[in-house]
Amino acid sequence: MSERAWGIVFALIGILAFSFRPILIKLSYAAHPVSPVTLLFLRMTLSLPFFLAIAWWLRNQEPRLTARDWAGIAGLGFLGYYAASFLDFVGLQWVGAGVGRLILYLFPTLVLLLSFLFLKKVPTWREVVALLVSYAGIVLVVSNQVAGENRLFALGAAFVFASALCYAGYLVAGSQMVKRVGSMRFTAYSTVVATVPAVLQFILLEPLSALDLPTAVWGYAIVLATVCTVLPLFLQAEALNRIGANQFAIIGAIGPVSVAVTSALGLDEPFTWIQALGGALVIFGVLLVSLRRSP
């Protein structure tokens, strides 16, 4: 397969693995009154050994990093891995997994906007049409979950939208950094850096007894740290390197569909024929932007 084809495959697998994250977060909240601060601490520290091992393995890789490179890695790690994750964890206390993914997966539009504003990249008509089709599908997938939310829904939605904005900024800026530093090295270093504020936040805000959690929560945290963090981060970094931020972001619209299905199975969130129709629209939009025309 071509580099672009591999990029699409990596993006799809990474996004599907990553989409299980809200399910595990909601299951953790349901199993025990664990705080977002503690859950994020567990996710970051349990995944840290993997990223440290990879960072050590790649320590002599060229090119050598400059002070400016390190500053960029630190800033992007804070923005894309710490801030975006924490805001999402907080928001998911008050919104359902499906609704949360609808808001979070607004990030493709934010990516296209930021790319236009800062990188002067004008979206093609195919990207615009794909966005319209995909987001029409997303609205159908989760529309019936929006009704009947309590007053905290707006607050949770605001946190998740802020998470989407942070992630979009990471994708746009990270696409340039990845090309210089390398996707694996960039991901490992930036995630290690992002663990620092997560640990400091836990130390400052939570007692040590907050780690006295049921076995189920620890199990969810381990899966969250490995299958839903380590694996998708590297797959998505490789995809970003091969297909760019705009197409990666639009392919990411398939995430809410997988969340709607898994939410229906694991969290008893509704999944109707209207949502199935929406899923079909999302997939069509993804194919529209992912498949090249025949010459």
Question: Language model features by range: what are they?
Answer:
Residues H32-Y82, L110-L114, C166-A173, T187-E206, ...:
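Transmembrane alpha-helices of multi-pass small-molecule transport proteins
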Residues I23-P33, V90-Q93, V142-F153, F202-A216, ...:
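Membrane-interface helix termini and inter-helical loops of multi-pass transporters
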Residues F41-L42, Y81, S85, V99-L106, ...:
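Helix-helix packing/entry segments at the starts of transmembrane helices
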Residues A17, P22, L52-L104, L140, ...:
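Specific transmembrane alpha-helical segments of multi-pass solute transporters/efflux pumps
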Residues F51, L114, P123-Q145, A198, ...:
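Hydrophobic transmembrane alpha-helices of multi-pass small-molecule transport proteins
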Residues M1-F41, F78, E149-Q176, V196-L200:
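Glycine-/small-residue-enriched transmembrane alpha-helix faces in small-molecule transporters
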Residues S28, L39, R43, G91, ...:
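Hydrophobic/aromatic residues within transmembrane alpha-helices
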Residues W6-L16, L42, E62-L87, L155-S163, ...:
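Loop-to-transmembrane-helix transition segments
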